[in-house]
Amino acid sequence: FYPNADQKTHWLSQLLPGAQVEFFVAIRNPATFLPALMAETKAAGPEVFLGDTDPLALQWSPLIEKIRRANPEASVTVWCNEDTPLIWPEILREMSGHEPHTQLDGIYDFHASIMTEAGIRRMLAYFQSHPPVNEVQRRRVVAAFLDKFANEDEIEVEIDLPGWDEDLVESMTEAYEEDIFAIERMAGVNLITP
């Protein structure tokens, strides 16, 4: 993924000499990322889009390693796109440099884009009358409301590519989970997880 990321991130880091640089990277399961990317680019099919690349070989860890090597003084924060609804406030706090318990405005604006209008209203009303005591409780409530009120068109990804079957998608997902584990162990990388 992103073969010139090392050069481009290094150039970005040089824009403000002496400034502390941080990079934030959302990763996504290649089994859902590729179909979405192909739909956006109107690619003819996976064989044209991927060429000789084996879909099982697609990993995010080399990208993160390249960014770290090109910018050894910079920290890199990574999260899985699939987890975004549960960890959105943490992402915002990390990106803005706020302390972990800082209450930010608009932390549920993202959820409004993936939930029904009735669902987001109910969730906000619930949080108003039952403020969560910690992040774990907040995540459980968000997960419960998403289970009931998610806008399926916004969160479901249809994987319908020629030559891709359930076994391939499952194998890609397992490889992605192993890749996440490798990223989590990298020095200078903060992986935000639920």
Predicted regions and their residues:
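Anion-recognition interface
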Residues: F1-P194
